[in-house]
Amino acid sequence: QKKIPLYRRSFSNKHATGSVITGDVERTYETFMTHKDNVVLLKLHLIDLSYMLEEMFARLFAIFDNHRIHINLVHNTAVDIYIAVDSSWHIDDVVSELMATGLDVDKQENVEIITIRHYDDEIYRRYDLDENIIIKQVSPQSIRIVRNKIVN
C-alpha cells in the first residue's frame, strides 16, 4: 500500500478548510456473539470409504432442500461431512433418504451453534478448552462452534 493521503475540499464553500483522509486510522471492531440452539448435527460417512465428490454434495443438498430444512453449517473431511441443521419433524425422513444413498448417518440432537466475530485471545482460550465442542471452525475474524447444549 502506498498510503497516499486524500485531500478533500467542499464544493459548496470553497473558502472552508478541507480535510485529509489517510490510512493511519486503526480500525477497532466490537466483539459480538450469536447463539442458535435447537440444532441437529448429522455426521455423514460413505460406507465404501470413497471420497465425497461434488455429485454427492449436490444430492445431499437436494435432499435437504426437498424437505425445506435449513442448513446452518457444513464441515467436511475427506470421507466425512458434518451438517448442522435446524431441528424439524422431517429430520427422520431426511436421515432415511441419506441412508438410502449409501451413507452411514449419525444423528446428534441437542447441539448448539455459537458464532463469535472479532474475537480476542481471551475469548479464544475460553472456547478452546470447552470439552463440549464437537466442531470448531476458526478464521482470522470469526470462530464457529458446534457443541453439546449445556443445560443449567
Language-model regions, residue ranges each:
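C-terminal catalytic "cap/lid" subdomain
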Residues: 1-152
